[in-house]
Amino acid sequence: MRIDYSEQMVTWEWDGCVIKIELPDIIHAEYNKNENIVIVYSGENFVSKIIFYFSLEGKLLGQQNLPEGTVDWNHNGQHQIVFHHLHHLRFSPKYQRIFSIFRSSSDFGLPSELEIYNLEGEKIDQIESPAGFTMLYISEISKKKLRIVCEALKDDCFDKSGRSDFYFNLDLE
């Protein structure tokens, strides 16, 4: 799907209609084919401050305010979650989940944890990083699993080829 955007407008075609949405300070816009949504990044000097999530019909599904550490969405009413020391967030309307990777402080040497919320705003799971590693970001979401990129916190956790990163597969069922 082709997405066109300028500093103040994002447009795309869906089901024979042209969808036009005005937003301030657009940095980038993209179609996420796995979620079947349009994601728009807004901010200043190429630094994102707000990420907007739209349905293909142009309906605002949710938005993430990066400086404030919040995500807001509408699902059977308005919801908001405030995150402290958030490192990575994935908003997944397709699987009706919000996945957040966070740390207990701003120290990047500490292992991160994953929290999973449903769209009612209820925390449904919390998972620690594998021993000796920290979770960096979610690379893939499916109905059955998450694929998370992890990084070693210490040299003794590197593999025999000297790699510090690996994929951690987390079963969701």
For every predicted segment, state its role.
Residues 1-8, 20-43, 49, 80-95, ...:
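Repeated scaffold domains used in trafficking and secretory/extracellular systems
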Residues 10-12, 17-23, 62, 67-83, ...:
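Aromatic (tryptophan-biased) beta-strands that constitute blades/sheets of beta-rich domains
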Residues 80-105, 110-113, 117:
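Charged linear interaction tracts used for macromolecular binding and regulation
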Residues 56, 119-120, 173:
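Short, ordered coil/turn segments that flank beta-strands lining enzyme active or ligand-binding pockets
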Residues 2-6, 41-44, 100-111, 148-158:
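Beta-strand C-termini and the immediately following turn/loop, strongest in propeller blades
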Residues 125-129, 133-173:
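Acidic, proline/glycine-rich low-complexity IDRs
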Residues 46-61, 70-72, 106-115, 156-168:
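Structural motif
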Residues 58-64, 98-100:
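Acidic (E/D-rich), amphipathic helical modules within compact regulatory domains
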